[in-house]
Amino acid sequence: MALIFDLTEDPQQVVQVSAWVGDWHSYVVRLVDEMGSPVDITTGTLGATFTNIATGSAYSFGGGSVTLTKQYSAQGILSVLNPAAYPTSADIRLTVSFTVGSTVRRFGPLEIEVLAP
């Protein structure tokens, strides 16, 4: 059974996980509003951003693109597959965007501490 992380629109509610350099992860997340209710993602466009917390710049996987797969759209559940394995240790912030028309909503962050073995 997969662990499902709730990502909210409140950037103060941070979810933290750890991973090893060389790991290639998929995360299952549920997008929820400020009240904790799931956001229906049936229609609209999803995006993901990986940011190095220390520098504020994009975290580089060295190639590839993130894969976002809607699992249970009405419940706001999707999987986020990294573009590649983590190449370097860092503290990373993953945020997910959901766009319908001209309205962009942002969820997260999921903070990932990538550790060197």
Q: What are the language-model segments listed below?
A:
Residues M1-P117:
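Contiguous segments within soluble domain cores/interaction surfaces
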